[in-house]
């Protein structure tokens, strides 16, 4: 879905007309790309065409409108997570843990993230505890979603941590019991749950928590109307994201933060995204450290 080289990024939009968004030298444009540039899985879904006239400062209002997060810090955090997820896999991304009680719209939130970052024909999938099934999903997806997770075993937790930092795993070849094949795992991961499912310290250190508010009766709408409203704004959201990425890629200013979370490269990218969105470095660091504390207590 995403190709990066130096300060240049290409995001694959549409396989029917071979179009992509190219970001370089602070500019975004839609252009044709050669067939061989991307490997396209059968589950690939074309992205809507972004409105590249939408500026970065318009991103936060759109996120505030469409994501039912608890407070303004979470509006900032989920915006940073979305933009960073579209910067490619040349650094490690946190697991996005979406948590909230019943009726808070967790699945809809995850669907929206997938539609922005890496839309698929299958949509989001229910969680399975089968390791081989999870390995297959992680090896096939840029953004891998697990919906309605109630428990994560130690083995699966370790597997998810490995996928965050990049690793290899083995699975049996089809129709054989003895032959193995090696698969590479490096994926951005989104998970929804009612209660905290990140129990191991390694997974906590590699995650960011997004807390959702329970919807009031007056706020409850049909999923069809919610998603229709979101799809209407999706070209504008994408335009704001791509222009934010253009600012991030052209930012050569050094990050001042002396202390960083475990995913230090992500922390630096978060600060650069914050700069483009008009948010001070210290504010971004405070949000990340507070989120780590909230996650350890959840």
Locate each region found by the language model.
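Conserved, well-folded catalytic cores of nucleic-acid-processing
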Residues: 62, 66, 85, 116, ...
């Amino acid at each position: 879905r995403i190709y990066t080289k130096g300060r240049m990024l290409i995001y694959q939009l549409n396989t029917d007309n071979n179009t992509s968004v190219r970001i370089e030298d602070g500019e975004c444009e839609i252009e044709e790309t050669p067939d061989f540039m991307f490997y396209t899985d059968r589950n690939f879904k074309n992205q809507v065409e972004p409105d590249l006239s939408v500026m970065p400062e318009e991103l936060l209002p759109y996120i505030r409108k469409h994501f039912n997060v608890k407070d303004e810090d979470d509006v900032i955090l989920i915006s940073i997570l979305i933009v960073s997820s579209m910067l490619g896999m040349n650094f490690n991304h946190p697991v996005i843990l979406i948590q909230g009680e019943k009726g808070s719209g967790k699945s809809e939130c995850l669907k929206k993230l997938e539609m922005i970052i890496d839309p698929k024909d299958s949509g989001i999938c229910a969680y399975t505890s089968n390791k081989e099934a999870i390995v297959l999903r992680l090896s096939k997806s840029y953004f891998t979603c697990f919906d309605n997770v109630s428990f994560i075993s130690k083995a699966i937790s370790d597997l998810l941590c490995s996928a965050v930092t990049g690793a290899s795993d083995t699975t049996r070849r089809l129709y054989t019991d003895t032959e193995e094949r090696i698969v590479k795992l490096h994926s951005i991961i989104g998970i929804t749950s009612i209660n905290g499912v990140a129990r191991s310290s390694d997974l906590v250190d590699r995650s960011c928590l997004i807390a959702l508010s329970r919807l009031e009766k007056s706020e409850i709408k049909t999923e069809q109307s919610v998603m229709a409203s979101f799809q209407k704004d999706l070209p504008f959201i994408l335009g704001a994201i791509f222009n934010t990425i253009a600012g991030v890629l052209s930012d050569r200013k050094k990050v001042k933060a002396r202390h960083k979370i475990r995913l230090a490269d992500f922390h630096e990218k978060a600060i650069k995204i914050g700069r483009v969105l008009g948010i001070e470095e210290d504010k971004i660091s405070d949000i990340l450290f507070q989120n780590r504390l909230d996650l350890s207590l959840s």
